[in-house]
């Protein structure tokens, strides 16, 4: 066995023309073995600039996928003033929403604004300073700005329903909520390995930690309740799905440029991040349902859905599934979100967001598969 580089070099000197397999090619140029690639990796990354290097010029693009995602994201731009919440106020104050449902919605809204604050701060503090390539930085900046819109939209909903300002820090009184925020914000990007793990966690933050709340709020849409709130959720889902797509691609590009960080321990840490995210969601779901169930959605269904969506996120990162939930346990989500207009649930299926030309359906939230 050729167990080390010295033995391999000695073998190749004795056997001219011998090559190990597989042989690596980049743009039809023969690089050689994995060891040969590692010897020239830094040179190759430096030649194209790399994710962590300032772009010398606007073009040529080295990460055109980031430009494409940014363009699509900006075409989906919206602001909180576009949302009509008048019917929500009538639902809330006119008896259409029960006391159990009010407590349920309030618990979700207590955390939602702060969750988007955490996500936005992560972009500004963890990622924008590190990723200096212009295409990627523009993508991250676009994502960060949209989180500000999410914050204002959910804050507007709180205020329109008459919830006091004290609700903005009420989440601190509940470990089920405070622990989620701690998880979302705790990262160490001081090393390449830590930066890679932080990118993976960002996919869990936006693609898992927010989605239980999305489902719990969007359920009211099915019964003609809180339709303005439902619109905010629909547009947020479109945004977060694009963010997850972009951050997953960034994670894989970063790992490709720094392959030495990707080992068994690195992958195991990501699986543990995913499992911990699910545990936190289970606790939060139990809190939301503490006063009882709501029409059309059981706590157990939300928990199963979170396992389903977590497996989809692992696939987007290029990893294997963990919970083995292959089918969406809430098929009504696809029906609700793939409609053409947001009018009355009983007359029309709910939304296809078309502001600035965005089209597409719920399945796009899961469409980015693994890379072998």
Residue ranges and their predicted role:
Residues 47-372:
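Non-heme di-metal
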Residues 7, 33-36, 229, 266:
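Alpha-helical interaction elements in eukaryotic regulators
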Residues 15-25, 34-35:
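Structural micro-motif
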Residues 2-4, 25-27, 143-144:
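Short amphipathic alpha-helical segments embedded in low-complexity Lys/Glu-rich regions
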């Amino acid at each position: 066995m050729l167990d080390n580089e010295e033995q391999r070099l000695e073998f190749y000197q004795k056997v001219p023309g011998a090559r190990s397999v597989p042989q690596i090619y980049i743009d039809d140029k023969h690089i050689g073995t994995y060891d040969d690639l590692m010897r020239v990796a830094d040179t190759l990354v430096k030649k194209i600039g790399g994710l962590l290097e300032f772009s010398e010029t606007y073009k040529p693009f080295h990460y055109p996928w980031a430009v494409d995602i940014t363009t699509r994201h900006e075409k989906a731009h919206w602001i909180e003033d576009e949302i009509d919440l008048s019917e929500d106020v009538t639902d809330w104050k006119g008896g259409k929403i029960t006391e159990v449902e009010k407590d349920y919605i309030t618990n979700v809204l207590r955390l939602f604004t702060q969750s988007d604050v955490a996500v936005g701060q992560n972009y500004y503090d963890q990622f924008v300073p590190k990723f200096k390539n212009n295409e990627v930085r523009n993508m991250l900046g676009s994502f960060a700005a949209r989180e500000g819109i999410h914050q204002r939209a959910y804050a507007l909903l709180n205020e329109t329903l008459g919830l006091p300002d004290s609700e903005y820090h009420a989440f601190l009184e509940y470990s089920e909520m405070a622990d989620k925020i701690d998880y979302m914000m705790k990262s160490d990007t001081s090393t390449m390995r830590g930066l890679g793990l932080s990118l993976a966690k960002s996919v869990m933050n936006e693609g898992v930690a927010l989605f239980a709340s999305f489902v719990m709020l969007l359920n009211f849409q099915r019964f003609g309740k809180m339709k303005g709130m439902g619109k905010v959720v629909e547009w947020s889902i479109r945004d977060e799905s694009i963010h997850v797509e972009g951050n997953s691609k960034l994670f894989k590009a970063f790992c490709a440029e720094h392959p030495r960080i990707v080992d068994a321990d690195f992958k195991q840490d990501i699986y543990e991040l995913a499992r911990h995210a699910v545990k936190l969601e289970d606790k939060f779901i139990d809190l939301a349902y503490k006063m009882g169930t709501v029409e059309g959605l059981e706590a157990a269904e939300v928990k199963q859905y979170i396992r389903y969506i977590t497996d989809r996120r692992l696939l987007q990162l290029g990893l294997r599934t963990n919970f083995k939930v292959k089918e969406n346990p809430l098929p009504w989500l696809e029906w609700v979100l793939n409609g053409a207009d947001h009018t009355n649930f009983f007359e029309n299926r709910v939304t296809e967001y078309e502001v600035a030309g965005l089209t597409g359906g719920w399945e796009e939230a899961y469409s980015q598969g693994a890379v072998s």
